[in-house]
């Protein structure tokens, strides 16, 4: 992983000529309404699928294969299923990047896991518990899930019949997540200083703090003291996501998004800000364009 310089602010202009049928017929207001799937490209005045301004994923030089729990990889009660991609023709030992999507099953960030595997990393993506599966699944639950996945990868390094037997760099792990699960990755950084880095994809986070947070938010909030950690951090954001997510009169949840998180990380911690111009909350959900290249 390239070393991240401190306090660099990068605004990237992402322009795409690709028009996607399922989003391109929408006007801006409808595009914003369907922001889970589409995003407005203000440079070209068109609606596109989420994921770095359109375009195709540019995979790296390595072939990769899939490992799942049906292949003998252990499961964990701390997350809801997993997909693990590993390079088949790269030189070990392999560093690992573990992803978790905002909601739903592991497939949500499958493209990111495949992308890093094609560049010589182990890429694992894990699923969330939802609804009746878990009564209490929050940011810390996601953090625990990421840490549990790390232990599963270490176990695979010891399992004789695993394709990862003796090829894992067991001292090098990066955690990543999108939106609320980016928040989970950030919580993990506050819990475990041995994490090598966190890569936060349009993150949202709040901490339970009965001393400093108001009762009307069930004592969830975000203040600088919550993010006092030394784990190198890459924060992705879309230029327009704050306006999409926060109303002008919102003084409760206004500081849980990407920019406040970046600002609250101590100046002594290596941190990097990456903003995609004209894009919203899905700007880094897929490994496309400059956002993908900057992750390497």
Question: Regions from the language model: what does each represent?
Answer:
Residues 7-17:
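Sec-dependent N-terminal signal peptides
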Residues 25, 30-42, 46-49:
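Extracellular Cys-Trp
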Residues 52-92:
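N-terminal cap/lid segment of alpha/beta-hydrolase-fold proteins
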Residues 92, 137-183:
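Gly/Ser-rich "nucleophile elbow"/oxyanion-hole loop immediately N-terminal to the catalytic nucleophile
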Residues 92-102:
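Short beta-strand element of the alpha/beta-hydrolase
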Residues 108-127:
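Short amphipathic alpha-helix adjacent to the substrate-entry channel of hydrolases
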Residues 182-192:
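Short glycine-enriched nucleophile-adjacent loop
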Residues 196-281:
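The feature captures the conserved acid-bearing segment of alpha/beta-hydrolase catalytic domains
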């Amino acid at each position: 992983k390239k070393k991240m310089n401190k306090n660099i602010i990068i605004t990237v202009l992402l322009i795409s000529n690709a028009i996607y049928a399922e989003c391109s017929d929408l006007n801006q207001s409808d595009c914003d309404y369907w922001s889970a799937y589409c995003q407005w490209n203000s440079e070209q005045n068109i609606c596109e699928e989420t994921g770095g301004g359109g375009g195709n994923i540019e995979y790296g030089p390595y072939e990769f294969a899939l490992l799942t729990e049906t292949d003998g990889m252990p499961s964990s009660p701390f997350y809801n299923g997993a997909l693990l991609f590993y390079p088949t023709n790269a030189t070990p030992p392999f560093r690992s990047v573990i992803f978790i999507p905002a909601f739903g099953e592991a497939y949500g960030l499958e493209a990111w896991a495949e992308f890093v595997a094609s560049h010589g990393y182990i890429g694992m993506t894990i699923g969330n518990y939802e609804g009746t599966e878990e009564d209490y699944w929050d940011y810390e639950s996601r953090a625990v899930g990421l840490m549990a996945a790390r232990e599963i990868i270490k176990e695979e390094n010891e399992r004789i019949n695993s394709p990862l037997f003796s090829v894992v760099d067991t001292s090098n792990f990066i955690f990543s997540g999108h939106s609320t699960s980016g928040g989970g990755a950030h919580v993990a950084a506050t819990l475990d200083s041995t994490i090598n880095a966190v890569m936060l994809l349009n993150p949202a986070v709040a901490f339970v703090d009965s001393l400093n947070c108001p009762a009307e938010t069930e004592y969830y909030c975000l203040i600088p003291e919550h993010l006092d950690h030394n784990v190198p951090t890459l924060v992705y954001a879309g230029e327009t996501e704050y306006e999409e997510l926060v109303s002008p009169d919102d003084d409760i949840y206004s500081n849980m998004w990407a920019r406040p998180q970046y600002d609250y990380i101590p100046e002594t911690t290596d941190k990097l800000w990456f903003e995609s111009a004209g894009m919203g909350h899905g700007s880094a959900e897929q490994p496309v364009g400059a956002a993908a290249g900057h992750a390497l």
